[in-house]
C-alpha cells in the first residue's frame, strides 16, 4: 500500500489532482527571495533615492506596519490595494516583502485560480486573481479571506457513503467518523486528526475514501522545517495534511477535521514579529 491520502491508488499512473497546474507551481517557493536575501538586496540601493522615487510604496509600507502591529489571528483581515503603484514601486514592494514559507492556489468557480504567497514577514500575504492581471492586493491576516471563503462556500456540508467495494477493510467506520465530526465541528472547537500513517487502510480503502470525499478547491504548501502540504477536500471542514521529509517522501499523512489547519496560519506572535521587523526595515532603508 502507498502511504499518502492523495497518492494514486495502486496501479494508477498519476496522483489524484483537480488543479490544472503542475508540481512546479506548488514548489514555486523553492529558490525564492528569503528574508536575508530581501534585506541584502535593499542594502545595495540608495535609501534617499528610493524614498523620493517611490513615495506611494514607502507610504504603503508604513500603513502596513501600523496595521499589522494591531492585527490578531482571530480578527478580520485587512486589505491593501496595489493599483496606485508604478512599476518601480511595485518592484520595491516585491523586494521588501520577498516570498515566505506558505504559498498556494484556490480554484474559483469560473475555472480560474487565485494565487497566494505569504511574504517573508509572516501574516502579510500577496493575492493575485488569475482572471485580472491588475487585481492583485496585499492582505494582513492569519490566512487570506479567499481561502476561508472557498473552504466554506465551495465545499459540501455533507456526503453520502455508497456501497463499499470488495476488498475494503476499515474505510466504512473511518468515513462514518469523518462525517460525524465534520457535521459537528464549529469555530472554537479543537480540530480532530485521523492519522493514516498508522491506520491499517488497504489501497481499496484509500481509493474509496478519495472517491467519496473528493478533492476540494484549495492547495497550500508550507516550507519551514521540511514541507507540509495542505489540501481541502470536497467536504466542508475536512482537510488533507501531509508532511514530507527532505527526500519528498510522506512521513505523516493525516485528515484534519476543523478550520484551516494551523500549519498554514499566521499566529499572534507572527504579527508582532513582522511589525517589528517591518518598522526596522523602514527606519533603516527609507528614512
UniProtKB/Swiss-Prot annotation:
Disulfide bridge map: none
Organism of provenance: Bradyrhizobium diazoefficiens (strain JCM 10833 / BCRC 13528 / IAM 13628 / NBRC 14792 / USDA 110)
Protein family according to the UniProt entry: Belongs to the HupH/HyaF family.
Protein name as annotated: Hydrogenase expression/formation protein HupH
Source domain of life: Bacteria
The organism's taxonomic lineage, starting at the top: Bacteria, Pseudomonadati, Pseudomonadota, Alphaproteobacteria, Hyphomicrobiales
Entries under Gene3D superfamilies matching the protein: HupH hydrogenase expression protein, C-terminal domain (3.30.1370.140)
InterPro entries named among the record's database cross-references: HupH_C_sf, HupH_Hydgase_express_prot_C
